[in-house]
Amino acid sequence: MDLENKVKKMGLGHEQGFGAPCLKCKEKCEGFELHFWRKICRNCKCGQEEHDVLLSNEEDRKVGKLFEDTKYTTLIAKLKSDGIPMYKRNVMILTNPVAAKKNVSINTVTYEWAPPVHNQALARQYMQMLPKEKQPVAGSEGAQYRKKQLAKQLPAHDQDPSKCHELSPREVKEMEQFVKKYKSEALGVGDVKLPCEMDAQGPKQMYIPGGERSTPPAAGAMEDKSAEHKSTQYSCYCCKLSMKEGDPAIYAERAGYNKLWHPACFVCSICHELLVDMIYFWKNEKLYCGRHYCDSEKPRCAGCDELIFSNEYTQAENQNWHLKHFCCFDCDSILAGEIYVMVNDKPVCKPCYVKNHAVVCQGCHNAIDPEVQRVTYNNFSWHASTECFLCSCCSKCLIGQKFMPVEGMVFCSVECKKMMS
């Protein structure tokens, strides 16, 4: 397929999850409706991952595409109908007998994802070493956490040009080269093993507390394997604490098998969140999630959340923007050359600020223009003018004077306060 056809096929999937309720805003949101180029709901401004949208198939396609043309193709399966790669995530179901007074019932726990290891006991140990609120048990807080991290750490628009907004043919080509490069140089999947199992296949030198390393025996020396096994200590590359004997550890092949992590320590070095499904990116001796690895390589537009492959873009408020996406967060009007106000790190045009965000003057009860001086005390504000910031009793101007605040009113003296009480 040539680049022109790829550009024509691009779309943001606006029908997906339409009308789904927001789990964060509840009844304040009318239902999910994807903004035409931002990756948020038009109604409540929350992301799709904050809404009750069933995304399992879509997420499996996204991760499947990420692993396509990599050494991790064993983790995907191509659908016979359309050849789309699907992520074969490992689902683990544990059954535990529960003793009751008269009979024994079975308690079943389903993990929406588990490390793909043959030893289920090892997988169970791994799960138990994660914080309870991050264990991906179906229907739990942990499953919702995993869903959010899949969306946050591995955005589809960081790997698939068809998920981006109006890329040029040149930008599509550059993005494809970028994705190919990070797949070959940085992408990896963690491996869960017992540290002692790695002695045979990994390097002889392993980390021990204090930063020291064990050394291989001198030539001709007799090796006492049992003594070596007992004396070898392993420490976590992240927290530097020792690993307990018999506890599972995570290895990252790109980091080398002389590094290992506690399950709860296998996190992104920027956001410090668990690396979802142990999918990592390795750069400069650090672990990254997909999002923050890409951020370390390319500027990201604060408007559409996509990586910027254009030669021309703008910088404002310590953020990067596509030229066409430096817009008012409320009405989408272009802000180049216009007055704007930052509200929660989002630029808002002056009319929208006055209409939706401006504080109201306690004196005249009108919105306070962002360019006008004001007086603020606690949660109350006034125009800094002789018409508004006045004693609530005698109307004396209080600019530059001492005053007594009482529930939104201000007084110039105790006498005036008593007269109004």
UniProtKB/Swiss-Prot annotation:
Domain LIM zinc-binding positions: 234-297, 299-359, 362-421
Localization terms from the record: Cytoplasm; Cell junction, Focal adhesion
Protein name as annotated: Testin
Main location: cytoplasm
Chain residue ranges for the region called Disordered: 133-164
UniProt family annotation: Belongs to the prickle / espinas / testin family.
GO BP terms: negative regulation of cell population proliferation
GO cellular component: cytoplasm; focal adhesion
Chain ranges of the PET domain: 92-199
Compositionally biased spans, kind Basic and acidic residues: 155-164
Subunit structure: Interacts via LIM domain 1 with ZYX. Interacts (via LIM domain 3) with ENAH and VASP. Interacts with ALKBH4, talin, actin, alpha-actinin, GRIP1 and PXN. Interacts (via LIM domain 2) with ACTL7A (via N-terminus). Heterodimer with ACTL7A; the heterodimer interacts with ENAH to form a heterotrimer.
Alphabetical list of Gene3D superfamilies matching this protein: Cysteine Rich Protein
Gene Ontology molecular function terms on file: zinc ion binding
Keywords: Cell junction, Cytoplasm, LIM domain, Metal-binding, Repeat, Zinc
Lineage: superkingdom: Eukaryota
Known function: Scaffold protein that may play a role in cell adhesion, cell spreading and in the reorganization of the actin cytoskeleton. Plays a role in the regulation of cell proliferation. May act as a tumor suppressor.
Domain notes: The N-terminal and the C-terminal halves of the protein can associate with each other, thereby hindering interactions with ZYX.
